[in-house]
Amino acid sequence: MIVCRSHAEIEKLRRVNQLVAQVLAELRQMAAPGVTTAEIDHVAEERVRTAGAEPAFKGYHGYPATVCVSANEQVVHGIPSNRQLV
């Protein structure tokens, strides 16, 4: 099924995608040895909420965080923690 979007809906999608790109660029810069995935998550949530948006993952089926962070041996959907990146 193809969903047709209005111009207003497309504009909202464009704006939120720009926000996501900006946040991901900032998080990419943060990802360095010694930084915890919880710190990355905190910054992501702060940036999203400051922009007037809501984190999509947080609370979805009980997911406790804003981002999914997988590092090293983790495969996917890692829950942010106080574990430092190495």
What spans do the regions from the language model cover?
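Active-site neighborhoods and metal-handling regions in enzymes and metal-associated proteins
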Residues: M1-V86
